Design a protein with these regions (language model features):
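N-terminal secretory signal peptides that target proteins for export/translocation
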Residues: 1-10
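Generic alpha-helix initiation/capping and coil-helix boundary signal
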Residues: 13-16, 46, 50, 150, ...
């Protein structure tokens, strides 16, 4: 029965076609429904600073919803990725951009644009940019300030910016009356691994302007710090024949003839109380002395306040307190 066999083969062939079509529809591989891959172009980097940049590019989504991100890092292996963002579903090229942060100064970075759509993932060409150097800057403080005459102090600070570590710097001083200009004090020193430094200073005899500057190029100069020198004062007590009175005497270094001494009673939690005073008199080429009587109204801790009048070479200071009973 030839007709019967031909009909049976035709039915089987038709069934096979239907089953194949169903399989393609289930797997999403129907030729008519296949999505084209997006096209991408990695653009240039803009707004590049020492710690951030904006990466740019173009994405053509080919009419289907597409996302994009940027890969970036210090090598062609990248290692970092920006957040996934929508690029739309246009049939034309669309400009995209993302800002990245946390970058290192003076460093070359690789980056590329990557688009992700139903038709696949496509990466653009690799491009590079270099972050700029952080300009060097100096900050410093002196401690203690004021410093007591004859005592050491320190000039400490930081050289910040690219290349601030292990950099040669020098300390410079311009002593009172600040007309001689800045002169280098001591030898150059190297900053530490994080740009920090500390200059010890012993022997400053008058108020001085201080600064730190780099050695070589680029020349970077710190703000000026005024280091003041307080007179050194001592005070002692001696009994007198006059009832209710004591004699307070002491020295002032350096010599400050004409300065005024005030005797003060100290009261915890309250302002000091003036109890009289006396002028400072010349004693030697390097020190002055004072001596004066004070009425002792009550026992307690007393100190001497030395008010200098040398037109700015030194600043006033207190003696250490003494107990008078």
């Amino acid at each position: 029965m030839p007709g019967f066999h031909r009909g049976r083969h035709a039915s089987a062939f038709a069934l096979a076609i239907v089953l194949a079509a169903l399989a393609l529809m289930v797997t999403g591989q129907v030729v008519a429904a296949a999505s084209p891959a997006p096209t991408v172009s990695t653009g240039g980097a803009s707004a590049v600073s020492y710690s951030a940049a904006t990466l740019n590019g173009d994405v053509n989504a080919q009419g289907v919803a597409t996302n994009y991100y940027f890969e970036y890092g210090t090598t062609g292996a990248y290692g970092a990725q920006s957040p996934l963002s929508p690029a739309g579903s246009a049939n034309t090229s669309v400009k995209v951009s993302q800002a990245i942060t946390g970058l290192q100064a003076a460093t070359r970075y690789h980056y590329r644009l990557v688009a992700v759509g139903p038709g696949g993932t496509v990466a653009g060409k690799d491009r590079t940019f270099t972050t700029p150097r952080i300009p060097l800057s100096l900050a410093l403080v002196s401690t203690p300030n004021p410093v007591v005459f004859g005592s050491p102090f320190y000039i400490e600070g930081t050289l910040s910016g690219t290349g601030g570590a292990n950099h040669a710097i020098v300390l410079q001083a311009n002593p009172f009356p600040y007309t001689g200009g800045f002169k280098t004090v001591g030898n150059p020193e190297l900053t530490n691994s994080v740009g920090g430094f500390s200059f010890p200073y012993l022997g400053l005899t008058e108020n001085a302007q201080l600064r730190v500057t780099t050695v070589g190029l680029p020349v970077v100069i710190s703000p000026v710090v005024l280091q003041t020198v307080a007179v050194r004062a001592t005070v002692h007590v001696h009994s007198t024949k006059r009832r209710g009175y004591v004699r307070l005497y002491g020295t002032v270094t350096p010599a400050e003839p004409g300065a005024q001494v005030g005797f003060q009673l100290l009261k915890p939690g309250h302002a000091s109380i003036n109890q009289g005073g006396t002028p400072v008199k010349a004693a030697t080429a390097t020190s002055s002395s004072f001596s004066g009587f004070m009425r002792l109204r009550r026992p307690g801790l007393y100190r001497a306040l030395i008010k200098v009048s040398d037109d700015g070479a030194h600043v006033s200071n207190y003696s250490a307190p003494i107990l008078i009973r």
